[in-house]
Amino acid sequence: ASGASIFIVEISGAVGGPMNRDLNGEELILDVDGDTSLHADTDDQIDFKLGGSDLMVFSTANTKFERGAFNPEATLTDASTISWSASTQPVAKVTLGGNRTLGAAANPQTGQFIAITIIQDGTGSRTVTFNAAYEFVGDTAPTLTATANKGDHFVFRYNGSKFIEVGRSL
């Protein structure tokens, strides 16, 4: 077919039946110029190279990122109860259009960090009631900045049952 591409993966040795191959010490080249690859080291480590440089290194001890990693900031929908997802919106912001309740973030993973910026609208002086799933220092939820168009930033760590506050900027 016109414009069709043919991909060839060359693996030494016989290939038959299910594709179960030992790639120990092998490098799988993922692009035409050979600078993007997966390499299965012999020391329980997998290197992912992009542009000829290590991008990520996975090992039994840890995962190493050679470049910055981030979650794009999601904009939450303002509503009487503000909903958000720890799995798809771990970094979020919302602009308050009235006094609101912040619902518990859905689908969290134990040990996960999440962050939210709560912004006052042009009127200001909006309040937020936090769901009981959020736990603050001294067991007291903070009072938000009342200034119009200003915001407060909160960071939480999920412990399996509660979102424990680990930082704030008011």
For each predicted feature, which ranges?
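Residue-level detector of short, conserved catalytic/binding motifs and their immediate flanks
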Residues: 4, 36, 46, 112, ...
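Terminal beta-strand-rich extracellular "head" domains
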Residues: 133-147
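Exposed extracellular interaction/assembly regions and N-terminal maturation sites
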Residues: 64-135, 150-170
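Tight coil/turn sites that cap or link beta-strands
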Residues: 2-3, 149-151
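Surface-exposed interaction regions enriched in Ser/Thr/Asp/Glu
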Residues: 1-19
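Residue-level "contact hotspot" at macromolecular interaction interfaces
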Residues: 1-2, 107, 145
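Secondary-structure transition/turn motif
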Residues: 1-2, 50-53, 167-170
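Beta-strand-rich receptor-binding modules of extracellular spikes/adhesins
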Residues: 19-67
